[in-house]
């Protein structure tokens, strides 16, 4: 039985790797000008400065969002938790809206670097608030509710700043809010890769504590594991990845929500350490597939992820309800 299980895991790993490679190549070949099969296009500036960074960012962002969602669901014991659940994404959007309004008023022009910095600063500001509040709130459910309310507050302020922004800046705000991998650079890809490596290293170092924490806080305490330390690690790692990805790509919906569930259906792993690569590969596949499809249909990636993610959530809820009454 163990040999059969190992063979199945190997076949699924091979199949998943081939799917990622296929989607990556398709992402490199297809652009706004259509398909590019000629060899000279592979050495062009379009390939190195646009398509390659975009494809690599889709892989890394898909990985980061999937892992962030996985850790949020683990932390709150809530299968519908996602990277945006604590308001980090709303904080980034608020930062971008504020800087867009302020930059136009002060300089008459909004610098792209300011948008990037504002998104990251807004996300980290929300994380800092949550870290301070976490010292007073020992109940994770209360922290979850606080994060959701903080997100709604940031969303309301964002709407006010959008209303106050110059009319010609609104298209840029709307475009950023749709999410995209198209305007990233190789430097940003490297920064996200570094952030991802640091976060995975931290989680792997604490994987035993996280495994025990996943069994319940009481069990963790009985085995001398601090639930608050584990929750802080998960919040920091999820928040950092969400902040960096949102700063570079804008808010990307549903990948962090759906990928962990799909990974658990496809991979028969139970430990958190083994689920990390499974969730990461699933996030890569979803992000690459949605990005290629978004280019082919000329739609924002959030439209594609929502069209795929929303039916998935509805199906999951229906299946869960059916199994309970079955």
Where are the language model's segments positioned?
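Alpha-helical transmembrane segments in inner-membrane proteins
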Residues: 1-326
């Amino acid at each position: 039985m163990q040999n059969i299980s190992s063979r199945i895991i190997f076949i699924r790993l091979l199949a998943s790797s081939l799917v990622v490679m296929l989607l990556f190549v398709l992402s490199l070949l297809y652009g706004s000008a259509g398909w590019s099969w000629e060899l000279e296009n592979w050495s062009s500036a379009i390939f190195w400065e646009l398509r390659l960074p975009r494809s690599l960012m889709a892989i890394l962002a898909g990985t980061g969002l999937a892992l962030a969602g996985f850790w949020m669901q683990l932390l709150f014991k809530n299968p519908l938790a996602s990277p945006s659940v604590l308001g980090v994404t709303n904080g980034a959007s608020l930062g971008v809206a504020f800087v867009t309004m302020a930059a136009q008023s002060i300089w008459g022009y909004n610098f792209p670097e300011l948008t990037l910095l504002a998104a990251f600063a807004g996300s980290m500001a929300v994380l800092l608030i949550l870290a301070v509040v976490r010292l007073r709130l020992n109940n994770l459910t209360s922290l979850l509710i606080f994060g959701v309310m903080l997100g709604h507050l940031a969303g309301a302020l964002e709407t006010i700043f959008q209303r106050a922004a110059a009319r010609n800046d609104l298209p840029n705000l709307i475009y950023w809010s749709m999410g995209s991998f198209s305007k990233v650079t190789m430097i940003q890809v490297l920064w996200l890769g570094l952030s991802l490596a640091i976060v995975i290293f931290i989680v792997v170092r604490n994987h035993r504590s996280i495994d025990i924490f996943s069994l319940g806080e009481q069990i963790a305490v009985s085995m001398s594991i601090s639930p608050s330390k584990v929750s802080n690690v998960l919040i920091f790692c999820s928040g950092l990845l969400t902040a960096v990805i949102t700063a570079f790509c804008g808010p990307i919906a549903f990948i962090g929500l759906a990928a962990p569930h799909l990974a658990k259906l496809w991979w028969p792993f139970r430990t958190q350490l083994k689920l990390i690569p499974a969730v990461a590969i699933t996030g890569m596949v979803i992000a690459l597939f949605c990005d290629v499809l978004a280019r082919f249909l000329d739609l924002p990636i959030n439209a594609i992820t929502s069209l795929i993610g929303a039916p998935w959530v509805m199906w999951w809820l229906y299946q869960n309800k059916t199994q309970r009454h079955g």
